[in-house]
Amino acid sequence: MPKRIAVLGSTGSIGRQALDVVRSHPEKFKVVGLAAGRNWELLAEQAAEFAPGVVSVWSGDDAERVRVRLGGGVEVHAGEPGLSAVATWPAADILLVAVAGTTGLVPTVEAIQSGKDVALANKETLVVAGELVTELALGRGVQILPVDSEHSAVWQCTAYRRTEVTGVVLTASGGPFRRFSREELERVRPEDALRHPTWRMGPKITVDSATLMNKGLEVIEARWLFDVDYDRIEVVVHPESIIHGMARLRDGTVLACMSPTDMRLPIQYALSYPQRWETALPVLDFAALGELTFETPRRDLFSALDLAYQAGREGGTMPCVLNAANEVAVSAFLDGRLAFTDIPRVVAATMEQHESKRRPELGDILTADRWARETAAAAAERVS
């Protein structure tokens, strides 16, 4: 029987690659729900191809356009209620959450409450509400399956030996500016930051990779996925991006997961788990690779990584504030209103003004998110 999946963010980078995986295994999947943001035309094309029972797009006007284009036979929704409709669609066995930012939080919670497994490509959900979401999943008996390449790698290294793991290692490409001086970083333009050396991603996550904030967010995500303390989560720069994650075992052994830099691999494993299916992707040629190198992150120039560790250790609503302030700062940078080196300054200034609330409920998290966005916007105006 095919696995029935719903996809939030089907027109984005991860969503499109997930549908590529479905096309590679048409007998093993049935797409029952699709949700997109503003690209209603691509959503309509996807719906015509996969014939889901429900689709959603952000605006009501676009929803009407989709309705007219498809001509019936599918429920069409809009906005946040639309995301919820797709996330809780009764026919779905598993939900792939591939929307950006905190937009994915509420539908992820709703999917877990409805008893669905979640393939999570939206790291912000665990960053801002890791304690709440993991406790809820445990209580409902559902699985959170990591899609990020680094977390998928660690997951595969630790799957059957959790009690033997003493630490995890996340690798980072280092981004396009890992050898830049402070003066060169101050001159970075948005178009420079959007040229990632190894991965094909959306603009926000590409900038986060350049600042190392993406790796910082992944550290917080790893804390909740693998139940490890921050002192046991390491970050190492690995420019070749062949080793995606490692696990340290209690006898000193280190297990590493290596694969080509193609997101369809971790996407497929999350959707096929516990099975592992064949792919048509090229295998690693170690002789052609020649060497694998590792470096220590330059924390003096890329302070976002330490800000993430700080927020994670403080806990409560502080990781939510870190994430929201970063989203505001990155948006200002992409719009040309903020310098690249001011992104972590805006985040730090926002965190300094926040008094974290312990064990927050969903409402507390959403309130902290709104406060942080307003505070970060004001901070961005001051430093620009």
UniProtKB/Swiss-Prot annotation:
Entry's Gene Ontology molecular function annotations: 1-deoxy-D-xylulose-5-phosphate reductoisomerase activity; manganese ion binding; NADPH binding
Family: Belongs to the DXR family.
Record's keyword annotation contains Oxidoreductase: yes
Binding of Mn(2+), residues: 148, 150, 218
NCBIfam families, sorted: Dxr, PRK12464.1
Gene3D superfamilies: 1.10.1740.10, NAD(P)-binding Rossmann-like Domain
Name this polypeptide is given: 1-deoxy-D-xylulose 5-phosphate reductoisomerase
Cysteine disulfide links: none
Catalytic activity entry: 2-C-methyl-D-erythritol 4-phosphate + NADP(+) = 1-deoxy-D-xylulose 5-phosphate + NADPH + H(+)
Keyword tags: Isoprene biosynthesis, Manganese, Metal-binding, NADP, Oxidoreductase
Enzyme Commission (EC) number: 1.1.1.267
Binding site for 1-deoxy-D-xylulose 5-phosphate: 123, 149-150, 173, 196, 209, 214-215, 218
Organism: Desulforudis audaxviator (strain MP104C)
Pathway terms, separated by semicolons: Isoprenoid biosynthesis; isopentenyl diphosphate biosynthesis via DXP pathway; isopentenyl diphosphate from 1-deoxy-D-xylulose 5-phosphate: step 1/6
Binding site for NADPH: 11-14, 37-39, 122, 124, 202
Cofactor(s) recorded in Swiss-Prot or TrEMBL: Mg(2+); Mn(2+)
One of the Pfam families matching this protein, by short name: DXP_reductoisom
Protein function: Catalyzes the NADPH-dependent rearrangement and reduction of 1-deoxy-D-xylulose-5-phosphate (DXP) to 2-C-methyl-D-erythritol 4-phosphate (MEP).
One GO biological process term: isopentenyl diphosphate biosynthetic process, methylerythritol 4-phosphate pathway involved in terpenoid biosynthetic process
